[in-house]
């Protein structure tokens, strides 16, 4: 199954396969003890929000008048699920997702596309990412970047760029 996943995952994340097509190729090419619907429910249930980070970015948008663009490698169905269930559209201006762009990180074109959509130059942007290689690629394009490892260090780095939360300070979370 891992080989099948590796062969199909990029195509799936680039929006060239539906979830049903992907699951049929990778999981349900043979009889299973669970249904595709059960597997989908399980898969979506694994997706958890990061409420502190969501609230931080929403606050920074209001406080500093920021334009928020999300650049992600994500398949269409999971992307829609997260946007809806985590209420991301309430503060995100554009979603540059691999499933829409048909290109995925680490391809630098997805970052260039995000800059074009946002109508922003690289030095105007702060990119937050938890994958070191993607941070390096963005930095190579002149985008100020933060390697997210935890809320507190990300807040500190944002503050160093002049972006503080509503209280004007970096604060600890419980």
Please describe what each predicted stretch is.
Residues 75-76, 80-174:
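Asp-based, Mg2+/Mn2+-dependent phosphohydrolase catalytic module
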Residues 8-9, 68, 96:
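N-terminal-biased segments
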Residues 67-69, 144:
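Proline-centered loop/turn at the N-terminus of a beta-strand
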Residues 1-55, 62-64, 75-77:
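N-terminal helical cap/lid subdomain that shapes the substrate entry/recognition surface
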Residues 64-67, 123-124:
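Short coil/turn segments at beta-strand junctions that form active-site/ligand-binding loops
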């Amino acid at each position: 199954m891992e080989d099948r996943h590796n062969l199909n995952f990029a195509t799936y994340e680039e929006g060239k396969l539906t979830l049903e097509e992907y699951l049929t190729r990778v999981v349900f090419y043979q009889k299973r003890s669970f249904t595709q619907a059960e597997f989908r429910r399980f898969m979506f249930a694994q997706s958890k929000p990061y409420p502190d980070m969501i609230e931080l970015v929403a606050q920074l948008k209001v406080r500093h008048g920021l334009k928020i663009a999300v650049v992600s490698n994500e398949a269409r169905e999971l992307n829609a699920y997260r946007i809806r269930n985590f209420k991301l559209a309430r503060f995100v201006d554009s979603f540059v997702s691999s499933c829409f762009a048909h290109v995925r990180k680490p391809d630098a074109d997805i970052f260039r596309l995000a800059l074009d959509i946002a109508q922003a130059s690289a030095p105007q942007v702060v990119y937050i990412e938890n994958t070191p290689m993607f941070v390096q690629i963005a930095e190579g394009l002149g985008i100020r970047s933060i390697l997210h490892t935890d809320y507190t260090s990300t807040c500190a780095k944002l503050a160093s760029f002049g972006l503080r939360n509503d209280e004007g300070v970096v604060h600890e979370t419980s």
